[in-house]
Amino acid sequence: MYGYRERIGMILPSTNTVAEQEFFRMAPSGVSTHVTRVKLTATNPEGLKAMADNARRATDEMMSCLADVILYGCTSGSFLQGIEWEEKFRKELSAQAQRPVLTTANNCHQALQALGKRKISIATPYIDALNQAAYRYYTDLGYDIVCMKGLGIETATNIGKNPPHVIYNLGKSAVTKETQVLFLSCTGIRSIEILQQLQDDLGIPAFSSNVANLWACLRTHGINEKLNGLGALMQLP
């Protein structure tokens, strides 16, 4: 049976072509990933808010495959409306599903806490409005964002078209002498091929939204397996 250790149910933006593939490549033996999608019409605040309105329907679909944990796999879609909204959204969906429902924004917060770092650089594919929302969300959580760099991509399907070396260079450009950890934000960017090399070259921890999501899903279900080649986070309990 696939998923005899854990079944992860992932709710993705309809435009995302990366997260599913990265989970398939990263997940340890016995962990399966099952995906449903919510319509994203535009990569802007209005489009992301409309997408979140369909989360209940998608959660129902994930429950029908007996997922052990359900992941709302959109970073900007879960930080956009702030800390209180994210917490309420997560708790309401968890109550509906009668099992843990996680959000990417909070998983990345938990990853930063586990790494024990407060001075962060964030690299994103986002437009300015979403970068500003990310800045507010993580600053409100108590982090010192020393640098933020975005690609300014307006068309969601173009996010996943960036080859890994583009994300490598974007990540490097966001790091300053003050940076203690690099966060590659967005489940739609392809980064697992370069993440370990980027961390090694920078000499500081680096993680992506997708790595934080897998780490959180595994730990929620008591799977503490360390996965090599995916940065410092996947070496933590």
Per-segment meaning from a language model:
Residues 1-57, 123, 128-163:
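N-terminal glycine-rich anion-binding loop in soluble enzyme alpha/beta folds
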Residues 52-65, 167-179:
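Short, well-structured alpha-helical segments in soluble
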Residues 56-59, 101-116, 212-223:
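Hydrophobic alpha-helical segments within soluble ligand-binding/sensing domains
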Residues 59-106:
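Glycine/small-residue-rich loop that forms an oxyanion/phosphate-binding "nest" at active or ligand-binding sites
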Residues 68-73, 121-122, 179-186:
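Periplasmic-binding protein-like
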Residues 89-154, 231-235:
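Conserved beta-alpha
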Residues 168-201, 214:
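Hydrophobic alpha-helical
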